[in-house]
Amino acid sequence: MGDKNDDDKNIEIWKIKKLIKSLEAARGNGTSMISLIMPPRDQVSRVTKMLGDEYGTASNIKSRVNRQSVLGAITSAQQRLKLYNRVPPNGLVLYTGTIVNEDGKEKKVTIDFEPFRPINASLYLCDNKFHTEALNELLESDDKFGFIVMDGNGTLFGTLSGNTREVLHKFSVDLPKKHGRGGQSALRFARLRMEKRHNYVRKTAELATQYYINPATSQPNVSGLILAGSADFKTELSQSDMFDPRLAAKILNVVDVSYGGENGFNQAIELSAEILANVKFIQEKRLIGKYFEEISQDTGKYVFGVEDTLNALESGAIETLIVWENLDINRYVMKNSATGETVIKHLNKEQEANTENFKVADSDLALDVEEKLSLLEWLANEYRRFGCALEFVTNKSQEGSQFCRGFGGIGGILRYQLDMTAFDSEDGEALDDDSE
């Protein structure tokens, strides 16, 4: 899987997390909220028939208000299903019903989408809340890890994804042992031995590239690599010039195992369990660590804070955009009705409570809000336009927590140095409003 696909997957996961949050918070009156999940290869006709039967049953509900809202929800589910001739390859998720919003007003909602990977659940429930349990399995990691188990008798290449392990290839090798005989030939024996070892390490390095680099994208097809084995072959491999640098960057751990082959593979999996469970955590620490390194070395290739980061983004200078996954800032597009000028502001909860932020500077004229969207959502939709990678981080690691508290939860690693003061003079007014 290329890095771009990883990016896309992380953003899909963030979107699902956000959706689950909003669905779980929604409540309705009576049992008028439908949760419908169809796995891949299910039949639309089966579900359409089932909804028809449900409609008949719901017509007998005694309470008129509840009956009408349940029938309304079933009808909107039927209408939405008409848009699909067949179930999409990854299945179909549909939520529809009448929810009660914060003001106590009723609002109809319908959400339907194809998950970003196959969903192995079949569900139909009519309740006073949406059921999202099945969506949680989409968040579970399907990362694939590569294992190279190397000792004096041979090498095994394998992968582990979830609980599925697979042996890709293994080969054995016959290396000469160290011995004290030979007299004058001792040097020659030692040289032959070193040569054979060198060839063995080279063969392993070449096969590693063959099995763990995707030729189509020229990127590793695994999220991380574990090198295992007895003796020091594994260390020799990891430090060798012959080992592909793209794979060297993916090494998560080097472990000592007492066996070679499949037994060694199993042992390596056990010894690496904790690291594999925390791989997202490790990637996050590395990413923010790299960001902090730019700051501590004062390279000028970093940016933080909402306005500076977005200015750098607009200028195409950001290589990696780093955002806290719970950043609570909204993006407002507002219009000055007197001049027709459009103003964009990014406000946190505190700033939203200040009415001055919704007025034209130095006047009492109110700005018309044309669009309000969470900044996170706007970035998830738009980041590709700016040619950067988007990384969502948590505040669970020490580095993540420091990034959220000390740097406002948004920043970026730049492609080149950028003078941020140039933006201040151009756009001083907006910056005064939005500075945190």
Swiss-Prot record:
InterPro entries according to UniProt: eFR1_2_sf (IPR042226), eRF1_1_Pelota (IPR005140), eRF1_1_sf (IPR024049), eRF1_2 (IPR005141), eRF1_3 (IPR005142), Peptide_chain-rel_eRF1/aRF1 (IPR004403), Ribosomal_eL30-like_sf (IPR029064)
An annotated GO BP: translational termination
Subcellular location: Cytoplasm
The species this protein was found in: Arabidopsis thaliana (Mouse-ear cress)
Assembly, per entry: Heterodimer of two subunits, one of which binds GTP.
Protein family membership: Belongs to the eukaryotic release factor 1 family.
A Pfam family per the record: eRF1_3
Keywords in alphabetical order: Cytoplasm, Growth regulation, Protein biosynthesis
Protein name: Eukaryotic peptide chain release factor subunit 1-1
GO molecular function, one term: translation release factor activity
GO cellular component, one term: plastid
UniProt gene name: ERF1-1
Chief location of this protein within or outside the cell: cytoplasm
Function: Directs the termination of nascent peptide synthesis (translation) in response to the termination codons UAA, UAG and UGA. Modulates plant growth and development.
